[in-house]
Amino acid sequence: MSLLDYFKITKANSTATIAKERLQILVAHERSFKNQPSYLPQLQKELLQVIQKYVNVEQDAISVNFEQDEHQETLEVNIVLPEKSR
Amino acid sequence: MTRIIVVTSGKGGVGKTTTSAAIAMGFAQKGHKTAVIDFDVGLRNLDLIMGCERRVVYDIVNVIFGEATLNQALIRDKHCEQLYILPASQTRDKDALSQEGVGQILEELAAKDFEYVVCDSPAGIEKGAHLAMYFADDAFVVTNPEVASVRDSDRMLGILSSKSRRAEQGLEPIKEYLLLTRYSPERVRIGEMLSVADVQDILSLHLLGVIPESKSVLTASNSGMPVILDEKSDAGQAYADIVARYLGEDIPHRFIEEKKGIFGKFFGSK
């Protein structure tokens, strides 16, 4: 291994660099969940119960997403209704 | 005023108990009346690291259940008369701790004029860990320069900022400090280990100190002496720096750079 190879490894391809990149992505992802209100799972469950009283939907037909930026918080509820049975 | 410090990490085996024992001894050596509490019910080990395992009669659960007074359960350290240890229970269920019980113990310690109470958290994020951090004023987040530990520390930071007494009551948040342990500057240089700067980039924490990977940590635990008492060792000195820095002394960081070899001593640029 030449001296040049040695420097290449310590810069871009080192395992420490890989570790840092992986952690930065992971931590950013996990922090985005951290600020979600704790009532979301319960809200999702109760909404589903109400909808199921009127429409025959599956468990996974509803998704609840919470997003936050500097100016506003958005609660997005998405319900997929079943195709009309004939 | 009593200051409550939690030593926490999320991940196990990163050096929480070693750190708790060392900093508690450090505060006491500087003349501050200090108590160190083991919150790891069922897996107590602080008594071993402090070298008082044969003097344990009562524990924190006995105090909470009224089976012993706090005075009966506190063990006075044999090296330093300003230091007291409150051991965890080895036999009880880990759910034996209660928030109310822990709160009462901390109030009683404040009434007895303890200046620092160090809470040695168990690993994980369950009840013991929750109660160890709940009443804290400051958090020492012990992290190894390693992916799993950094991730768990970040998770712990989220819990400190949302589930603590200070968070619930809308008080000033817990002050969080980074203690980077088992650090190896040699491995950082050759790209095998995350650097101090890398970990700080990810966690955005105030660095209280770096403790180098050191043989003295194991030898200190072998003989039941907090490593800070080994004043010649690098880890002992690193903990002494951390204690002084926390108490407000302006001490430059050490142990981040490699020790200079014989060539460095002769030809070193700085």
Language-model region placement:
Chain B
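Amphipathic alpha-helical transducer elements in NTP-driven molecular machines
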Residues: V57, N71, Q99, G103, ...
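Walker A/P-loop NTP-binding active-site region of P-loop NTPases
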Residues: I4-A68, Y116
